[in-house]
């Protein structure tokens, strides 16, 4: 009986919805922040608004905005969110509902795109956030008369692009994390859980362990630790399967390693986090305050990586931007390196990297490391001092790379002069240990050869040499903040 009553009510409700046309809602983006939705009053007793930002509604779901308004004001029913931060190009999907004379009426499938801003009084604003002048007698330009209709922007637009809809103003801060709160997986950063492989084949596995990845004293902390510390003395000779939580490609060596006579499981646990799922950008200025780690064969990763790898997935053919790198050995700790990488092997691997040699080790204290990336050039600076600039040559990087036998370089011809650095990149922070490309064979006290089958075994067998250099107070990469600005 109850079910029958409900069905009858539902039929009556749906029929009633068809009997009266709900007035179109007026949506307004308010500067500097706010959303206002309203309809004119016509004797209604309730107005409800349900909507989502940049995501379609699934039927009659509640949505991000879900509000019932029970009283009209000055002849209109008004929903207001005073904290909404809307950008040009943002799209709101919504449905509305009204009650009149005890019956409900609904308007579905609403869509609205932000094309400009208004002030609190509803007056449209110009590019300077001032009300558009109504005193001028000159008619506005018409479409087809030299100016196409389109949105008005409250600022001078930047060449920078971001991975979320909307416009970007010149000099606008696009991203900031001061690491004042614990890492929340996926909220901003995603920890990588995998075995890194080609092209550098470092001697570590990325994991999310409290001892090697955490936030403390306002800093991101990433440090290395032997695998045997976490998993026992024979861990390097046992299969390590990360498949149930691996962020790499399942079914490959990125998620599972089996040891053999010549190959051990990577003997060091480090960490790496990225913003691939939450934030990526094209062109901008990256500023990162960090204290570099000290210890033999430690390689801090402070870099930008391509989201889609449109020019190829192997050997850095889609590019890698090193914001800063100071290797931890005593012979390297006074040498800062930054810039673009477009090949895994020499001589082109380091052809465009720039160096800044200091009188004091870069590992002693925090420094502000900056990389500015534009459609024409990539510029590196530290503490406000520019130490390197790579300008895209006429015709792009193809010619010089082709001369160095970089086979995939021909793909860059499809892009702009700065290709492969003309696509979206995300932020990556982490640490590698050793590997087959970062350290030349002539490095002091290096216990392995880059081309040796037992390179990782030889590294591990020499732990009595390098492990004492990993002091607890020095071996961590510390990051105070990460900021990205539009050009």
From Swiss-Prot:
GO biological process terms, semicolon-separated: carbohydrate metabolic process; cell surface pattern recognition receptor signaling pathway; innate immune response; regulation of innate immune response
Q: Can you say what this protein is called?
A: Beta-1,3-glucan-binding protein 1
Q: In which tissues is it expressed?
A: Fat body and hemolymph.
Recorded hits in PROSITE patterns, A to Z, give:
CBM39, GH16_2
Region forming the signal peptide: 1-19
Its GO CC terms? Answer: extracellular region
The organism's superkingdom is given as: Eukaryota
Q: Which residues form the GH16 domain?
A: 157-487
Q: Provide the function of this protein.
A: Involved in the recognition of invading microorganisms. Binds specifically to beta-1,3-glucan and activates the phenoloxidase cascade. Causes aggregation of invading microorganisms.
> Where is this protein primarily located?
secreted
Q: Where found? A: Secreted
State if Lipoprotein is listed as a keyword: no
* Protein source organism: Manduca sexta
User: Keywords for this entry?
Assistant: Glycoprotein, Immunity, Innate immunity, Secreted, Signal
Q: Which PANTHER family match?
A: GLYCOSYL HYDROLASE-RELATED, GRAM-NEGATIVE BACTERIA-BINDING PROTEIN 1-RELATED
Q: How does it assemble?
A: Monomer.
- A Pfam family reported for this protein in Swiss-Prot or TrEMBL: Glyco_hydro_16
Q: Which InterPro entries match?
A: BGBP_N (IPR031756), BGBP_N_sf (IPR043030), ConA-like_dom_sf (IPR013320), GH16 (IPR000757), GH16_GRP_C (IPR035806), Glycosyl_Hydrlase_16 (IPR050546)
Tell me what PTMs the record reports for this protein.
Answer: N-glycosylated.
Family per similarity comment: Belongs to the insect beta-1,3-glucan binding protein family.
Glyco sites are at 368
Chain intervals for the UniProt region annotation (Disordered): 123-151
Specify whether Secreted is a keyword of the entry. Answer: yes
The entry lists its GO molecular-function terms as: carbohydrate binding; hydrolase activity, hydrolyzing O-glycosyl compounds; pattern recognition receptor activity
Record's compositionally biased regions (Low complexity): 133-150
Q: Where is the CBM39 domain?
A: 20-119
């Amino acid at each position: 009986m109850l079910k029958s009553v409900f069905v009858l009510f539902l039929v009556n409700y749906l029929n009633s919805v068809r009997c009266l046309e709900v007035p179109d809602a007026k949506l307004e983006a308010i500067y500097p922040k706010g959303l206002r939705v309203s309809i004119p009053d016509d004797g209604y007793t309730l107005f409800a608004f349900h909507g989502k930002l940049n995501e379609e509604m699934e039927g009659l779901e509640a949505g991000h905005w879900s509000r019932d308004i029970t009283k009209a004001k000055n002849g209109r029913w008004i929903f207001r969110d005073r904290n909404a931060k809307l950008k040009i190009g943002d799209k709101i999907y919504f449905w509305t509902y009204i009650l009149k004379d005890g019956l409900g009426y609904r308007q579905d499938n609403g869509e609205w795109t932000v094309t400009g801003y208004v002030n609190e009084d509803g007056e449209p604003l110009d590019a300077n956030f001032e009300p558009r002048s109504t005193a001028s007698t000159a008619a506005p330009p018409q479409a087809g008369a030299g100016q196409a209709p389109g949105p008005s922007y409250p600022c001078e637009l930047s060449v920078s692009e971001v991975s979320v809809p909307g416009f970007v103003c010149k000099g606008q801060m696009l991203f900031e994390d001061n690491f004042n709160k614990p890492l929340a997986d996926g909220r901003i950063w995603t920890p990588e859980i995998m075995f890194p492989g080609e092209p550098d084949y470092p001697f570590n596995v990325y994991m999310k362990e409290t001892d090697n990845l955490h936030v403390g004293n306002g800093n991101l902390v990433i440090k290395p630790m032997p695998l045997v510390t976490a998993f026992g003395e024979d861990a390097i000779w046992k299969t390590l399967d990360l498949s149930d939580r691996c962020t790499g490609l399942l079914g490959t060596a990125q998620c599972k390693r089996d040891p053999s006579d010549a190959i051990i499981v990577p003997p060091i646990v480090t960490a790496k986090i990225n913003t691939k799922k939450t934030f990526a950008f094209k062109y901008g200025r990256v500023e990162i305050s960090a204290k570099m780690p000290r210890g033999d064969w430690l390689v801090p990763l402070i870099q930008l990586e391509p989201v889609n790898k449109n020019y190829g997935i192997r050997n850095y053919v889609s590019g890698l931007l090193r914001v800063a790198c100071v290797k931890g050995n005593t012979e390297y700790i006074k040498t800062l390196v930054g810039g673009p990488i477009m090949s895994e092997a020499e001589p082109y691997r380091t052809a465009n990297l720039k160096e800044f040699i200091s009188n004091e080790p870069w590992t002693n204290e925090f420094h502000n490391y900056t990389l500015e990336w534009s459609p024409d050039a990539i510029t590196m600076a530290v503490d406000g001092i520019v130490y390197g600039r790579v300008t895209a040559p006429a015709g792009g990087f193809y010619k010089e790379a082709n001369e160095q036998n970089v086979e995939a370089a021909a793909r860059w011809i499809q892009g702009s002069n700065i290709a492969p650095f003309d696509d979206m990149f995300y932020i990556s922070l982490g640490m590698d240990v050793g590997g087959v490309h970062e350290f030349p064979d002539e490095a002091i006290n290096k216990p392995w050869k880059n081309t040796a089958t037992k390179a990782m075994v030889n590294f591990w067998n020499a732990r009595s040499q390098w492990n004492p250099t990993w002091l607890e107070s020095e071996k961590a990469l510390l990051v105070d903040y990460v900021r990205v600005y539009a050009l």
